[in-house]
A protein has these predicted regions:
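Short alpha-helical transmembrane segments in multi-pass integral membrane proteins
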Residues: 1-59, 102-149
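Hydrophobic alpha-helical transmembrane segments of polytopic membrane proteins
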Residues: 55-69
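Residue positions within transmembrane alpha-helices of multi-pass solute transporters
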Residues: 27, 65, 92-95
Length: 149
């Protein structure tokens, strides 16, 4: 029974994280349309802020889902797995940043494309890898066995 409750709670928490990510992401992206002036009077900087906030807002559902699973796995005491996968995800992210800076960045047309690419790399590679790792772990039984059985 504890196993079934943990499975159900995981599913519902992940869903809630995704839905919260949609809502927060939409608000964040919309705020990005007007928030640039809070950061700088320079119109070029304002456009960079707007672009970054829109990209982050679009990626927020993935992050909400991933962070919800983080919470479940942290609550289950699955620290060693999370530490390893966070470190591995960071290495993938760093490699993607190096590729972006040296191989792709010089061919991007302007600073708006570069800021969008920078945030996309963070969202896709860092958060994406963490999401894959957390999703695979949550589907398995190891963390449940360690936590509730």
């Amino acid at each position: 029974q504890a196993y079934d409750r943990a499975r159900n709670l995981t599913k519902e928490t992940a869903r809630a994280g995704f839905i919260a990510g949609i809502i927060i992401g939409a608000v964040f992206a919309m705020l990005g349309l007007v928030a640039g002036s809070l950061f700088s009077p320079n119109p070029a900087i304002q456009k960079l802020v707007t672009t970054g906030m829109i990209v982050v807002g679009i990626l927020m559902p993935l992050q909400g889902w991933m962070w919800a699973l983080d919470g479940i796995l942290i609550g289950a005491g699955d620290f060693r797995y999370l530490a390893f996968t966070c470190g591995a995800s960071a290495l993938v992210h760093i490699a993607a940043l190096v590729v972006l800076v040296f191989a792709i960045g010089p061919y991007l047309p302007d600073d708006l494309a570069r800021i969008a690419a920078l945030w996309l790399v963070m969202g896709v590679f860092l958060m994406g890898c963490r999401g894959i790792a957390n999703g695979l772990r949550a589907k398995g039984d190891t963390w449940i066995k360690n936590a509730v059985l």
